[in-house]
Amino acid sequence: TTGPLGQGIANAVGFAMAERHLNARFGDELVDHKTYVIAGDGCLMEGISQEAITLAGHLRLKNLIVLFDDNAVTIDGSTALADATDQMKRFKASGWNVARVDGHNMDAVRGALLAAQTADRPSLIACKTIIGFGAPKLAGTGPAHGGPYGAEEIAGIRKSIDWPHEPFVVPEEILKEWRKIGAQGSRHREAWEKRLA
């Protein structure tokens, strides 16, 4: 999400509605994409998010998938300072498919995404995470939200995730994968453009 908190999820509901409208008009051959959102605790605490998720649930926007970065921390500290909402129950009550995963377990996230892609309604995947994961002193704290980490914290993170590469360097094996995915995307785009013509 970008801009004022809560706006991103509301915008995404609009994008998902537009996709469904275009799909109804042009069919699956031309329009069949999903809308993905990454939203944090603060995003879901805003009032506009309730209106947006209610509408999405009511319209059964099965093409909408929200990944909720559930780290229970805002810039002011713990979310418990200002909010006691059970987001899973809130979304379920609004007609959504809901799942909870360990947000640091990529296999679990991938599995939840695959399930959400075939759901008959919008999906919330609550990814339980630790803000500042791997930082020796800042992990799980308010200062991890937006403060400077410093050399010691950065070194601790790099060690905890076994990242030996220099700063601002993309390792060759990752670059190869990115390029492979880019080429695959280009092939899909070219095939879509042929169908569009």
Where are the model-predicted features located?
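Hard-cation-handling environments
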Residues: K180-A197
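Glycine-rich ThDP/TPP pyrophosphate-binding loop and its adjacent helix/strand module
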Residues: T1-A183
